[in-house]
Regions:
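ATP-binding N-terminal substructure of ATP-dependent carboxylate-amine bond-forming enzymes
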Residues: 1-47, 51-53, 57, 76-84, ...
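Active-site nucleotide/adenylate-binding loops and adjacent lid/helix of ATP-dependent enzymes
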Residues: 9-10, 51-133, 137-139
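A glycine- and small-aliphatic-rich helix-loop capping segment at beta-alpha/alpha-beta transitions
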Residues: 32-41, 112-117, 242
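Hydrophobic beta-strand scaffold residues
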Residues: 40-41, 69, 94, 246
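Phosphate-binding site of ATP-dependent enzymes
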Residues: 111-189, 213, 218-219
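Conserved metal-phosphate-binding beta-hairpin within the catalytic cores
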Residues: 134, 143, 198-231, 239
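Active-site "cap" helix and flanking loop/linker of ATP-utilizing ligase/carboxylase catalytic domains
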Residues: 155-207, 237-258
């Protein structure tokens, strides 16, 4: 709770390691607070973090920079779903998600238009704006960024009992796997796209760029400025596969602030 964050007795030379998941950390609130108080902190600043948290704004930035991202439309909280929109005649499978939220909460995969309204209503519980996105339902990849370098890309193999890499597959399942990518050309393409996407949002130091595929098409799904940071999380795992242990990773992130 940021309201309980008492900074009066904190030395001005203190460096804050930002690892707050969800609201407060991933939406830029804690970064904004620390900046205004004159404290240094790890990772991206308030503006960059806010851009990545807002999926609609982030997609607009990606499109402006000629970076592929799944086609989408938006629906505001009090707006009704219009199935006559041309979008629904072009695309037949969708992901419905809150425009501002994380951890795949409120996200649904929809294969039948009859289920779309229910999915939109679920997403509205988490955000005032909802995205209906073209389903890129094939492979999922992720690339961690550390001090301007793309680390070893990973392929995410969700629990087969889940229809996609949802909250259960991320946090509750023991069957989700993260594996190295054998195709080196693909790995290099993902690295290049990740760097371009990361810096198109003016991000800094470290983060993670997630990808989805549909056939031969690779698209940026989202950019995470405060990704999970347990030893089993994707960024530490990518670092380990790149020859950087957990303690070294922490040190490199902090040293970039000093």
């Amino acid at each position: 709770d940021l309201n309980n964050l008492n900074l009066k007795e904190v030395d001005k030379d203190t460096v804050f390691f930002i690892a707050v998941h969800g609201f407060g950390g991933e939406d830029g609130q804690v970064q904004d607070l620390l900046s205004k108080k004159g404290y240094r902190f790890t990772g991206s600043d308030y503006e960059s973090t806010k851009k990545c948290w807002d999926k609609v704004l982030s997609k607009e930035i990606l499109i402006q920079n000629n970076i592929n991202t799944p086609k989408f439309i938006t629906i505001d909280k009090h707006e009704n779903l219009n199935l006559n929109d041309e979008f629904f005649s072009e695309i037949t499978e969708y992901f419905v998600k809150p425009a501002k939220n994380g951890s795949s909460l409120g996200v649904s995969r929809v294969t039948n238009l009859n289920d779309l309204e229910s999915a939109v209503n679920d997403a509205k519980k988490f955000s005032d704006q909802v995205i209906i996105e073209e389903c890129y339902g094939d492979a999922e990849y992720t690339v961690a960024i550390l001090n301007g370098i793309a680390l070893e890309p990973l392929e995410i193999l969700p629990d087969p009992k889940q229809s996609f890499y949802d909250y259960k597959a991320k946090y509750l399942s023991g069957e989700t796997k993260k594996v190295e990518i054998i195709d080196k050309a693909l790995a290099e393409e993902l690295k290049a796209m990740a760097i371009k996407a990361f810096y198109s949002h003016d991000c800094n130091t470290w983060g993670r760029v997630d990808f989805v595929t549909k056939g031969e098409s690779i698209a940026v799904l989202e950019i995470n400025t405060v990704p999970g940071f347990t030893e089993k999380s994707l960024v530490p795992l990518a670092a380990k596969k790149s020859g950087i242990n957990y303690q070294q990773l922490i040190t490199e992130i902090i040293e970039d602030v000093l």
